[in-house]
């Protein structure tokens, strides 16, 4: 696989209204398919809204829930990645990323780092994921998916990249932390720096899918993006407005970048493993 057409859906959603949000997903997926897309990606918790609080247990569903059948059916022709509240087989409730492809659905990532500070309180309502792993997609190749706060921990993209991800996708529901003033809000420039830095250091594509709109006291800022493996921004969606970015992933760029600068390929994983084990066991520090 050398190229893939990916639509990045920077959307708003209706809090705790699964049916309305599902219909919006289906509409955009159908439009993307007509536009020649191989895949479409939506933000964190795009099927439910973010600030569901105690309703999370009532909204949570197994990945094989019949209510998700419309996405499964559409996925015969287009890969769909979106955010939802997952009910595990053990009845854990997770902030998860779902992937629908070839008529099947699967949970591909459970959010690990649940922010519970300031305006955030995710640990009150969700269990933390316990696995960092890539997923193989027929249309997108080997990808690594993270959810918002996960990407503020360098260990997550580090492990995904070294498992072979040539595309790292982060689903976000990132709100403003203060009233916007002159220039870009700090949270916007921080995320731009994160995307550019990881893309460059790991020589991989980084796709950020953020939402927009207002929800309770939260204002989501959008600015979804695709960054190339040399750390250069390829496309950006606007601030605060819904938009579907139509992007092309040329995976030959990963090869060119890694051959030009081999810092990623030169990483000594055995050394890192040994040193981490020393820290964990208390032999260092």
Describe each PLM feature range.
Residues 82-84, 95-99, 133, 224-226, ...:
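Short beta-strand scaffold segments in enzyme catalytic cores
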Residues 18, 26-102, 106-108, 174-197, ...:
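Cys-nucleophile CN-hydrolase/nitrilase-fold catalytic domain and related Cys-dependent amidase chemistry
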Residues 10-16:
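Short polar catalytic/cofactor-binding loops
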Residues 63-66, 88-193, 256-264:
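Active-site catalytic loop in hydrolytic enzyme cores
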Residues 63-81, 152-242:
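CN hydrolase (nitrilase-like) catalytic-core segments centered on the catalytic cysteine
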Residues 2-8:
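Extreme N-terminal starter segment of soluble prokaryotic enzymes
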Residues 23-37, 154-164:
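Short amphipathic alpha-helices and their capping/turn segments at secondary-structure boundaries
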Residues 252-285:
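A short C-terminal boundary segment appended to hydrolase-like catalytic domains
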């Amino acid at each position: 696989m050398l190229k893939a057409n990916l639509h990045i859906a920077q959307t708003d959603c209706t809090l705790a209204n699964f049916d309305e949000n599902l219909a919006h997903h289906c509409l955009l997926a159908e439009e993307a398919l007509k536009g020649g897309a191989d895949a479409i990606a939506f933000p964190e918790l795009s099927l439910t809204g973010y600030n569901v609080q105690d309703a999370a247990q009532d909204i949570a569903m197994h990945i094989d829930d019949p209510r998700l059948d419309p996405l499964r059916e559409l996925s015969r022709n287009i890969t769909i990645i979106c955010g939802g509240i997952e009910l595990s087989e053990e009845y854990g409730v997770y902030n998860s990323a779902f992937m629908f492809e070839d008529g099947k659905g699967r949970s591909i990532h459970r959010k690990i780092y649940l922010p519970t500070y300031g305006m955030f309180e995710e640990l009150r309502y969700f269990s933390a994921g316990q696995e960092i792993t890539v997923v193989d997609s027929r249309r997108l190749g080997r990808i690594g998916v993270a959810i918002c706060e996960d990407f503020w921990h360098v260990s997550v993209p580090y492990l995904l990249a070294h498992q072979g991800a040539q595309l790292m996708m982060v689903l976000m529901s990132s709100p403003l932390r203060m009233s916007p003033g002159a220039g870009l809000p700090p949270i916007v420039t921080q995320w731009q720096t994160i995307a550019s830095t990881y893309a460059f250091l790991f020589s991989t594509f980084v796709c950020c899918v953020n939402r927009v709109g207002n929800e309770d006291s939260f204002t989501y800022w959008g600015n979804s993006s695709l960054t190339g493996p040399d750390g250069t921004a390829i496309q950006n969606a606007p601030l605060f407005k819904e938009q579907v970015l139509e992007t092309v992933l040329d995976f030959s760029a990963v090869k060119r970048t890694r051959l030009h600068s081999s810092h990623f390929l030169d990483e000594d994983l055995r050394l890192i493993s040994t040193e981490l084990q020393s820290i964990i066991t208390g032999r260092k520090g």
